[in-house]
Regions:
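Divalent-metal coordination cores built from histidine and acidic residues
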Residues: 1-88, 149-152
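Divalent metal-coordination and catalytic microenvironments
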Residues: 11, 59, 122, 162, ...
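Structural motif
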Residues: 20-25, 56-60, 85-87, 107-109, ...
């Protein structure tokens, strides 16, 4: 979203010699929607050079669902370019008709299902469902509970985290945590391990080389002390113990200087964060605990007066949220109100240019 092809090239270079299989999907929606001010815009022609890279497996989560469903030309060119590779989805809250159109476009998977009913609809349309259990979004319990209650097949289900904080990985584990929790909820352990391994690699188009211990497969495997508790003894990559490999010195690619100088904010001042309110009932971004999806609500919000002008006043229930254009020096700032963040007398200012 900030550096375009230079950013993609940097990620590919940085992960070339890692002690693990790091594959890259090319971002499909830069910007995520037409309403955003991005550092760059990526078109299909900008993605062509990555098609022959063996570590580029396809097109990353297609989140502009409206462009897919309506057949918008630029989006169709991207989907056509990657039609012989894997195409990841990002499709929350679509109705049955739109979900069918979305699947018809060639999108192979989705990780945004947060109910068992929605996951079933995606599976019925031939899609893989990556059950997400991360730091913010936790969907595993709802989906796995439905699978267990209905004694449903797990063949089109896999695991992902979709943003899990380092401290949570250290405390809980990563995909290992998903396996453990799924077994505890009643899924057959063999099926849980298949969801984490061979079914995932089959979905991404690598099911004939990784994801199983069998002739012709890479010797990437985990040795366990306890099968059901997923208590890990050691990890092997390319047949070698990773713990021993970590002791060796390795060359790490340097970050190009121009990628370090990307935060450019023009004429920013406190006044740009003032949120003027004409009516006390105001549209608000409402957060949903345990989910990354939000909803629009209209509620009466706290106000104060500034020279007889009504302005929003944050409190323990309602916080102020702002988007500051940070790449092209446009000076654009958008302010709004958000509910459920639970911050008082503090501020957070991340520069990450995540998706929408």
């Amino acid at each position: 979203n900030v550096s375009g092809n230079d950013g993609i090239d940097y990620i590919l270079n940085q992960t070339e010699k890692t002690l693990g299989n790091v594959f890259v999907m090319i971002p499909s929606c830069v910007p995520a929607t037409s309403f955003e001010d991005n550092g760059v815009i990526l078109y299909a022609k900008d993605m062509e050079k990555y098609l022959k890279n063996p570590r580029v497996l396809g097109l990353a989560e297609v989140m502009d669902t409206r462009s897919v469903i309506t057949g918008e030309e630029s989006m169709m060119k991207k989907l056509d370019l990657f039609k012989d590779k894997n195409i990841d989805g990002h499709a929350p809250l679509l109705n049955d008709y739109d979900l069918s159109a979305y699947a018809l476009s060639g999108v192979r998977s989705d990780h945004e299902a947060y109910t068992n009913q929605y996951a079933k609809k995606e599976v019925e349309r031939g899609m893989y469902v990556f059950i997400r259990e991360g730091s913010a979004a936790k969907n595993l319990e709802a989906i796995v509970k439905g699978i267990v209650n209905e004694n449903a097949s797990t063949e089109r289900y896999c695991f992902c985290t979709d943003d899990k904080h380092i401290e949570d990985i250290i405390l809980e584990g990563h995909i290992s945590y998903n396996i453990r929790k799924t077994i505890e909820m009643g899924i057959n352990p063999i099926k849980a391990y298949k969801m984490a391994t061979i079914q995932s690699t089959q979905c991404i188009g690598k099911g004939k080389s990784i994801g199983a211990i069998a002739p012709g497969y890479k010797a990437d495997f985990v040795v366990l002390n306890d099968f059901e508790k997923v208590d890990i003894n050691s990890v092997y990559f390319n047949g070698e113990n990773v713990e021993k490999l970590l002791e060796l010195e390795r060359e790490i690619a340097a970050c190009p200087e121009h990628l370090k100088q990307t935060v450019k904010v023009k004429d920013f001042n406190r006044d740009k964060l003032i949120l003027k309110v004409k009516k006390e009932k105001f549209p608000i971004v409402n957060t949903i605990p345990g989910e990354v999806v939000t909803e629009k609500i209209v509620e009466e919000i706290p106000i104060e007066y500034n020279n007889e002008e009504k302005i929003f006043k944050a409190n323990e229930i309602y916080n102020k949220i702002a988007v500051v254009e940070r790449k092209n020096n446009t000076g654009k700032v958008g302010a709004g109100a958000i509910k459920g963040f639970g911050i008082t007398n503090d501020a957070i200012a991340p520069t990450v240019a995540h998706d929408s």
